């Protein structure tokens, strides 16, 4: 019998606020899968890497935004039909003005703010965004 274990993926929920209200940080992807699509920042956990460290590493790699692993709280865990296990980590709300400015990275066109739930490039990201805007991750 062969076993296939799920591949763990971390996804960052970084709430921010400004004069227009509260929003979530999202990215526009420049790599497959979902090139050109809008998604939450995230990616694979490296071998023997703590999931909170992976989450803040991916957030910084894709947005330039820094955060502390100790500030990450597990908001949700969802299994994707393609064999991935997504761990959604919630970070504390921050002022948008204090974030690194949006700039292209190796994997994204930079970051933007999502001000209301909308369909994202990955269905589970869409579900998590909807849950966050409905207040289910508070």
What is the role of each PLM region?
Residues 1-39:
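N-terminal strand-loop-strand
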Residues 43-138:
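Unchanged
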